[in-house]
């Protein structure tokens, strides 16, 4: 297939990202090539690292991690908006070893998905009705000491508020997008990640593209997560807590 034929074939699909398929062939993505990857803080060298890309869409970040030497990359999505054709097309043309996983974030389970050194959760959180549950699910698929990268819209008005705030959007208030449910402030993102089992949370890119922010979080050890859950149960039920920890 010539370069022109490849461009024509790629043009049949909807692309959010511009993915370089060959030196002279880039998919016609809405967001532009490499539009935001520089602010995500993804390590340049991923040699030996396992990666889970949650909400991968057309696979841009999954393929990029593969290029950076990741040992294993799993690309997870439900592909409900525009289907999986664009992902499959790029996967084939790049001769990629990325593993597609058709799963809702709410259904992610380490028993079948595994646990990973690096989990990407980019441009997904604010689209979900249940963001804390989603963070708990991706944290469960992160190895102890592993890194979670979250890219999300934030609430600008409460950006400097140290109290966690999350604005609910029942309609199309944000960028005329009815799929945006929430705008958390940075404190809310950090505290939700902490409640999901992360020890360290860093706001690595405080603001880009007007209302977006990037966070890195380090997953606690299994023992630390167990102790946190135990203490949280006691704290939240301290008035009625008389017996042993459930299951003990």
Region roles according to the model:
Residues 49-57, 149-171:
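Conserved class I S-adenosyl-L-methionine
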Residues 60-107:
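Class I SAM-dependent methyltransferase SAM/SAH-binding core
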Residues 196, 202-248:
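Core SAM-dependent methyltransferase catalytic element
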Residues 132-147:
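A short glycine-rich, Lys/Arg-flanked "PGG" loop and its adjoining helix->strand segment in the class I
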Residues 179-197:
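Short alpha-helix
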């Amino acid at each position: 297939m010539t370069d022109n034929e490849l461009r024509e074939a790629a043009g049949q699909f909807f692309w959010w990202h511009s993915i370089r398929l060959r030196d002279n062939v880039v998919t016609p993505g809405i967001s532009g090539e490499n539009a935001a990857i520089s602010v995500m803080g993804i390590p340049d060298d991923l040699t030996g690292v396992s990666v889970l890309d949650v909400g991968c869409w057309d696979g841009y970040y999954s393929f990029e991690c593969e290029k950076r030497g990741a040992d294993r990359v799993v690309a997870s999505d439900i592909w409900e908006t525009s289907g999986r054709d664009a992902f499959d097309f790029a996967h084939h043309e790049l001769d990629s070893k990325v593993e597609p996983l058709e799963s809702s974030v709410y259904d992610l389970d380490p028993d079948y998905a595994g646990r990973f050194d690096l989990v990407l959760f980019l441009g997904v959180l604010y689209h979900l009705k249940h963001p804390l549950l989603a963070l708990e699910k991706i944290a469960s698929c992160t190895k102890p000491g592993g890194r979670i990268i979250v890219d999300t819209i934030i609430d600008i008005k409460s950006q400097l508020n140290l109290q966690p705030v999350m604005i609910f959007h029942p309609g199309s208030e944000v960028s005329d997008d009815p799929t945006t449910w929430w705008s958390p402030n940075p404190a809310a993102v950090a505290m939700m990640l902490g409640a999901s089992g992360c020890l360290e949370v860093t706001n690595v890119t405080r603001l880009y593209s007007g209302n977006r922010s990037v966070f890195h979080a380090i997953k606690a050890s299994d023992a630390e997560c167990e102790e946190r859950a135990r203490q949280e149960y006691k704290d939240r039920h301290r008035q009625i807590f008389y017996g042993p920890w459930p299951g003990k």
